[in-house]
């Protein structure tokens, strides 16, 4: 019979298999809806690339360091740099990977001419082809050395200003954001030695209970 009630439980994150929400974050919106509360914008979900274990968004410098996207068989064998099948050249692929760092989350307007095509390609690789996708920070996309001159000006100038226009993805990530590497190491994944499995994950719900 109270006049106001604060129902701070979070959204129904547990309804998605691939989710960046903490595993125990089930949400209790349904209980309020069953009790008669009205919902609003419940279909407005955001999706983006995130690591599977631990659950964490791989935006920002994780992408701007330009890691390789590898597709593997379920047992980890048969690694393939599958993005090369979709981009005309390694430079175009790298530019899309770099932009994924700040064009977040998935945006339908950025599929044809933006980085959201990466979200679609990861989804197709994992859910349609039944493979796994990992980020490899130990080798440059396309193999060989980073060709900074082939990057679009925004990416090249950003990396140059950050003192990270060199080396391998892990070298660039350590230069730009060492805590990003420490975060995974403290949770059992050493990016200096091993790849990071990712998926297209539910990341945020813009709706909830109508107030």
Indicate where each model-derived feature is located:
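FAD-site-proximal beta/loop scaffold in flavoenzymes
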Residues: 1, 193-211
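Glycine- and acidic
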Residues: 11-14, 161-166, 193-195
